[in-house]
Swiss-Prot record:
CDD domains: Gnk2-like (cd23509). Keywords: Repeat, Secreted, Signal. The keyword Lyase does not apply. It is found in: Secreted. Residues 32-136, 151-259 form the Gnk2-homologous domain. Belongs to the cysteine-rich repeat secretory protein family. This is Cysteine-rich repeat secretory protein 8. Residues 1-27 form the signal peptide. GO terms for cellular component: extracellular region.
């Protein structure tokens, strides 16, 4: 016999509001960093055509964010042209992507350092949004902003040296694979996830790797960008068990499971975030 539960109006409202609040809390995009060009020559006034074009561009990106994980737009005539784009993580639902882009396009203009800047870039774990008065489409910036998020738990010493080569080899494999997903007609362009079992004499573990490039890059530049990320990881978090590294045109995330437990100085579950105006890769 079926069992039915009758909700009174107040109780139903409580559960409805609780579920709504929980959904909003869980889906809240996680901000990582905001970068703005601090050159005085790249300022604009609040009554300028550039400001109006920027608002139109950000609104356009918000509107397009429900259609896919990437879009770019160009608004206005020179010298007030604004170029912009968004890129969502490839495993997000359309709703989560749209939520992140909407949040990012609103927050980027609220940042005190970005209010009057012609160039800005905002990173969330789920997406990134940027705009500029100079076109950046199809380009890999070798010295642009970066964000790294990584665990303070480290690899056992016996596996440390071999892991870097394992990760580098894995990324090279995925660079070849990702080229086949470069078309904008693909369900998720330039996004590949791989789960592999790594067997070493010193121990075995599972390596979960995700790579993604902005679809405006060609396959060759996508590879350049991802190789820069690997070098960037070696400059910040070379022996971390988990890491995410973001450049303006590509992203890499890896996680390892099945290794013996080790403690970092702050605890094995501690996470650190490193960011900078200039990519650490070229200095390696």
């Amino acid at each position: 016999m079926a069992t039915f539960i009758r909700f009174t109006a107040p109780l139903f409202c409580f559960f409805f509001l609780f579920s709504l609040f929980s959904h909003q809390t869980m889906s809240q995009p996680q901000h990582m960093a905001t970068f703005c060009d601090d050159r005085l020559s790249d300022n604009f006034t609040q009554t300028s055509s550039y400001k109006a074009n920027r608002e139109t561009l950000l609104s356009s990106l918000r509107d397009r964010s429900s259609l896919g994980t990437y879009s770019n737009a160009t608004i206005g005539l020179s010298p007030d042209t604004v170029y912009g784009m968004f890129l969502c993580r490839g495993d997000l639902t359309k709703t989560s992507c749209s939520d992140c882009v909407k949040t990012a396009t609103l927050e980027i203009t609220k940042n005190n350092n970005c209010t009057s800047r012609k160039t800005a870039l905002i990173f969330y774990e789920e997406c990134m949004v940027r705009y500029s008065n100079v076109s950046f489409f199809t380009l890999v910036e070798l010295d642009g902003p970066y964000v790294a998020k990584y665990s303070l738990a480290t690899f056992p010493t016996s596996l440390f040296s071999s892991f870097q080569q394992t990760l580098s080899n894995k990324v090279e494999q995925l660079i070849i694979l990702i080229a086949s997903k470069s078309s904008l007609s693909a369900s998720t362009p330039y996004y590949v996830k791989d789960i592999s079992r790594v067997n070493e004499l010193e121990g075995s573990y599972t390596l979960d790797t995700v790579v993604q490039c902005s679809p405006d890059l060609d396959p060759a530049n996508c590879g350049v960008c991802l190789r820069l990320v690997v070098k960037g990881l070696s400059g910040c978090c070379t022996n971390a068990r988990f890491a995410q590294f973001y450049l303006s045109k590509c992203f890499l995330k890896y996680d390892t499971t099945g290794l013996p437990t080790s403690q970092s100085p702050s605890g094995s579950s501690s996470i650190n975030v490193m960011k900078g105006e200039h990519n650490i890769c070229p200095r390696l």
